[in-house]
Design a protein with these regions (language model features):
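N-terminal leader/targeting and accessory segments in enzymes
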Residues: 1-98, 102
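Walker A (P-loop) phosphate-binding motif
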Residues: 100-110
Length: 110
């Protein structure tokens, strides 16, 4: 497992539970022991986290079900209609920026 994935696995649960952009977590999901964070549903593997980003040309929320079928451990979305089995945040783009900053800071402290 690459070092950045190991760091994400070690610190994700603490990060998400204190994240200011968090709206809701499905209590049934296990926030530990995943492979990686993935934004491309075509590349999802079993036990990955799918981050449903939306842009000008696509809406990642349209691919939540596909990512589940491919075996994602859970997903992160800003669409309240997809909360079962996932994490609801204010903005998935801001979440991606914030988790990246968090991991950079954790890496500096090591």
């Amino acid at each position: 497992m690459p070092e950045e994935n190991r760091l994400l696995n070690l610190h994700f649960e603490n990060f998400i539970k204190s994240y200011s952009g968090l709206l809701k977590i499905d209590s049934r999901i296990d926030l530990t022991h995943f492979n990686t964070l993935c934004t491309d549903s075509r590349k999802i593997n079993k036990n990955d986290i799918f981050l449903a980003l939306s842009g000008e040309n696509f809406d990642g929320n349209e691919f939540v079900n596909e990512s589940i079928e491919k075996g994602c451990k859970f997903f992160i979305t800003e669409n309240p209609s997809h909360i079962n089995g996932g994490i609801l945040v204010k903005s998935t783009l801001e979440f991606l920026e914030d988790i990246a900053k968090f991991l950079i800071n954790v890496n500096r402290d090591i």
